[in-house]
Amino acid sequence: MQIYSEYYEKIGPRKLRLLVKRRLLFASTWLYINNYILLSIIMKLQTKHMILLGFVAVVVVFIIFMLTRKKKEGFSIGNIFGKVKGAVTGTVGKVVNVVKPQGYKPEFVNRVNFGKFWACPEGTTDWGSEDKQCLVSQYGPMMWRNKGGNEWGWSCPAGSAPNNSDDWNQKCVQGYSMKKLIDGQWRCTDTEIDTGKDWSNSDWFTAQQQCDRGNNKVFTRRMYIDGKWQCPDGTWDTGFTWSDGENGGKQCKYYP
């Protein structure tokens, strides 16, 4: 302090004030320039690099944290990428399953031998095809068939009714038929149940479910028509009679 005091005494008051002003001006200028440079850097980082630097910082902190965990967890950088890859592929698989769901797959079985002929087992419906013989499932596809009078087209086999579905394999529901003109009356066969549905009280689909065949989808019995016992329209006589034991009720087979 003495040295500085002696120096300031030598230069005089006027020169001292001038020196102080110069140093203050230099200090303020230097501080202004530093602040300007720092603010410029911060502004550029905010617009271009702050997000990236923040993400890098989070990743670095996460990796450091995971590396400090117990070795028994078997953590490594490779495990991170493996988990990420598994998560991504698993998500894609779920999306594919949503976009392409499994369609309805009806079940079919083959016809069996009844001694005199081959026919579908009871509880199924003859689908009139060699590769799709007897429908077990509730729903099935339309078939290219003779709809009557040598008129061919896509339709549901006899013993099934059209179903209101966009799935081709669910276009037909088995176990239903239309009433037939039997002995002058529109009625169901003796083994069918009248559902009460008709064109006056049902839509186009359910109106064709007039007779429920229940478990008797393949065979029915002879009916007293025109003064004699005979098979109704839409069936053919199998030759079985009540004396044939368990086959006694299989007197008339429905056409597919």
UniProtKB/Swiss-Prot annotation:
Source domain of life: Viruses
Keywords, ordered alphabetically: Capsid protein, Disulfide bond, Late protein, Virion
Gene Ontology annotations for the cellular component aspect, listed alphabetically: viral capsid
Record PTM: Stabilized by 3 intramolecular disulfide bonds.
Disulfide bridge positions per record: C120-C134, C156-C172, C188-C211
Coiled coil: none
Subcellular location: Virion
Induction: Expressed in the late phase of the viral replicative cycle.
Span list, region Hydrophobic: 24-44, 47-67
Chain's role: One of the minor capsid proteins that constitute a network internal to the major capsid proteins and outside the lipid membrane. The minor capsid proteins glue and stabilize the capsomers.
Subunit structure: Interacts with the major capsid protein.
Domain notes: The hydrophobic regions might anchor the protein in the underlying inner membrane.
The name this protein goes by in its record: Minor capsid protein P7
Annotated organism of origin: Paramecium bursaria Chlorella virus 1 (PBCV-1)
